[in-house]
Amino acid sequence: MQMIDRRGFLVTAALAGLGVAAGGLRASAADTRLRCVWWGSADRSKRTNDVIALYQKANPQTEVSGEMIAGSDYWTKLATSMAGRNVADIFQLEPSTIADYSGRGACMELDQFVGKSLDLSTFGKSEVDLCRIDGKLYGVGLGLNSFCMMYDADTLKGAGVTVPKEQITWKALAELARDFKKNGPAKRNYWAVPYGARYHYVFDVWLRQRGKLLFQDGTIGFNKEDAKEWFAYWEDLRENKLCVSADIQTRDDNTIESNALTLGNSAIGFAYSNQLVGYQKLNKQTLSIGMLPGEGPGKPTGHYYRPGLIWSISSTSTNGEEAAKFINFFVNDLEAGKVLGVERGVPPAKVVREALLPTLNETERKTVDYIESLSGKLDSYPEPAPIGANEFDRGVMRPIADSLAFGRASVDEAAQNLVDTGSRTLRKRG
């Protein structure tokens, strides 16, 4: 993957391709109706609905019904609609779920529409292939992102601590949390850092820094000792009251609104880089962005570029061609690109990136600069996640970490449970 010059805006790197549906006969042009669902913040919902309005204005023969589903309910409703063969024509996925849901038969294969309803001419092959599973294209990457740490630099500075420009180490983060407790604001239920044991994507980065993987060959890529070391790090912070308490941390449902940073309980939050736009809208303090902690200079950072979010088309849709046209508009139209900004990540289409550059505000520019700063510091993109990866996050890792945080399990028990239950939950595709 190669970065283009800064005036050219950003990478030719790592984004996923655009998708077009393969299903069924197209409905009459006079009465084509599409359903489109996603999760995310109110800001994302407004941007998406504004693009839907633009599309309908340009295509009055098509009606697009958009719906934002709260993150806590999205996957439950998607599973229910899959069981009833009533999945929306266009639905949002992410890297850890596209492999899972395509393996369950929920996603249409999109290759047959490339170069027809779907223009991929500004995408490199490596960009398209990020949403290719077992050689078949199942989704459309909507923006480039990576993992990150967002933080209130002014509040940290007021406590006499700072986050270095380069990647902070895990040891230094623990020391920062200790110093913040001593010198930070006298504010009830306020810490420097979250209780990060429950974040599967942070665990993913931590494992990569040690030469391990979260998933490998259709199952877990780590062992009990890895899990013990991970859980022990966070338990040491929690037991010394240096991180967000269990009763508050367990409210986090991996949404911007429920993160301890947004709730005013921590000065630092773990997230994905494109989410800076949404976090800043809900935080009065100016937020900074940097890498998740690491092991120090010269060591693997554990980060990689990823398609932040993905549009897929339901395998049961009877309006596949029109759904493909909508996705094509979503990622290639200049006006749509200006509305969407970088809220879902840095746009994959070069022409959209270049048109967007002069319009970015300070927060959006931080997102782009962060993605650019990662060039030359990244790991390779992982193999497709196994079937059950979404359940591993929501139904395995979070509950086990929460049980540990509430003192209902020891580090050893939690680690063994993560290995055993994780192994049972995952299965290889095909």
Regions found by a protein language model. Give the residues of each.
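N-terminal secretory signal peptides and thylakoid transit peptides that target proteins
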Residues: 1-17
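Extracytoplasmic "Venus flytrap"/periplasmic binding protein-like
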Residues: 50, 54-123, 157-160, 258-268, ...
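Hinge/lid segment of periplasmic solute-binding proteins
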Residues: 95-148, 288-290, 360, 365, ...
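C-terminal capping/gating helix-and-loop segments adjacent to ligand/active sites or protein-protein/ligand interfaces
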Residues: 368-421
